[in-house]
A protein has these predicted regions:
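N-terminal ligand-binding/catalytic initiation module
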Residues: 1-109, 117, 124-127, 296, ...
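Short helix-loop-beta connector
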Residues: 123-130, 152, 215-216
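Glycine-rich Rossmann-fold phosphate-binding loop(s) that bind the pyrophosphate
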Residues: 136-137
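NAD(P)-binding Rossmann-fold cofactor-contacting core
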Residues: 150-173
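Short acidic low-complexity segments
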Residues: 178-193, 208-209
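Short, well-ordered coil/turn residues at beta-beta hairpins
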Residues: 197-200, 222-223, 246, 302
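Rossmann-fold NAD(P) dinucleotide-binding segment
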Residues: 203-219
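Rossmann-fold NAD(P)-binding glycine/threonine-rich loop
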Residues: 214, 222-278
Length: 347
């Protein structure tokens, strides 16, 4: 079995180059969304606690099965820990044998940003140049980098309640090639924004954006509302928007649309990417992607990592680990402890 550690991923991305790596993730994810009907899909299994949530996110096609373990603990940073950490496993369906264990903390941030970019391809105006981001925590830089893959951005305004988070974001974005504008309020941040990303972490019902703060024809990508009782946008804004989600069954439970019915949803994202339904239809309509994160996205990126693990030039970034016993007699599992003959551990 192979292992992709955080150090292995860092070295893999350095070898490929961040732009090329982001491009590969986008291409792979779009291709998997388009073959939506080939996947066995289910909403994530969430266990909620007063201080956070722990989730399992499975997805499979006819060849591979994946699942991700992921948490969400907004107060972790007060204790020097990440709010979100994740691990993933990819297995072959035919035997059920796991093939890869992968870090998924960084890959989750990357695939989440890739969804933002894919939605922007269909929902943002093609001439969008100014991006605004509300919330400059761990996800923010990935979001901007991915959107730059699909839109020719020129400027970026940003706001967070935490000045240190804005300092961190500004330092990381210094080499982005964008004109940066640090703002003192959400309203100020949205001035002249062609596209808006909301990426806040507080688990509560919010109403962050007023309709009259938005430029006509703006596109909003809301990713902070991702569990029951946690939303970022008010009813007036939702009802004025063309809404696209990843997976209706999950979004109606967890997303911004959790207090609306199914008729409020224009489409699932795969339907836009596959050309089944239109995305943006005018320069003035308000569009909204209500993104909560879906397991197909994890399948896509961990399968891409598995592909890299067998390619010359990249396989060295993956470790071989002995996690499964190989038996001379597969019915004699106990023999692993009692005999050294014909008994090995399988990497």
């Amino acid at each position: 079995m192979k292992l992709l550690s955080v150090d292995g991923l860092r070295n893999l991305v350095a070898s490929l180059g961040q732009t090329a790596f982001y491009g590969a993730v986008l291409e792979t994810l779009e291709r998997d969304f388009i073959r939506w009907g080939e996947f066995i899909k289910t909403p994530r299994l969430a266990t909620h606690y007063p201080f956070g949530v722990i989730e399992l996110m499975p997805c499979a096609d006819r060849q591979f099965y994946t699942f991700k373990y992921v948490n969400g603990h907004p107060q972790n940073t007060q204790h020097g820990k990440l709010c979100v950490v994740a691990l993933g496993i990819l297995a072959e369906v035919e035997s059920g044998y796991p093939l890869l264990i992968s870090e998924m903390t960084l890959l989750t941030a990357i695939r989440t940003a890739a969804v933002t970019a894919l939605a922007a391809k269909s929902l943002a105006r093609p001439d969008s140049r100014h991006l605004a981001i509300i919330g400059t925590g761990a996800q923010a830089e990935f979001q901007v980098g991915m959107v730059q893959q699909v839109l020719a951005l020129e400027s970026l305004s940003y706001f967070d309640l935490d000045p240190k988070a804005m300092d961190k974001f500004a330092a990381n974005m210094a080499a982005s090639g964008l004109q940066l504008r640090r703002c003192r309020s959400i309203e100020e941040t949205l001035k002249e924004a062609d596209m808006v990303i909301t990426a806040t972490a507080a688990k509560r019902v919010n109403d962050l954006i007023q309709l009259d703060w938005l430029k006509p024809g703006a596109h909003i990508h809301a990713m902070g509302g991702d569990c029951p009782g946690k939303t970022e946008l008010g009813q007036a804004l939702l009802k004025a928007s063309k809404i696209v989600v990843e997976y209706r069954q999950q979004s109606l439970l967890e997303g911004e649309v959790q207090n609306l019915d199914d008729s409020a949803v224009h489409a699932e994202l795969w339907q836009l990417l596959a050309g089944q339904l239109p995305g943006r239809e005018s320069d003035t309509e308000l569009t909204l992607c209500d993104a909560v994160g879906f397991a197909l996205e994890d399948f896509s990126i961990i399968k891409l990592m598995h592909d890299y693990s067998s390619q010359d030039g990249y396989r060295q970034y993956f470790d071989e680990i002995a996690m499964l016993p190989t038996m001379a007699d597969p019915k004699d599992l106990y023999g692993f402890f009692t005999s050294a003959t014909g008994v090995t551990s399988q990497p």
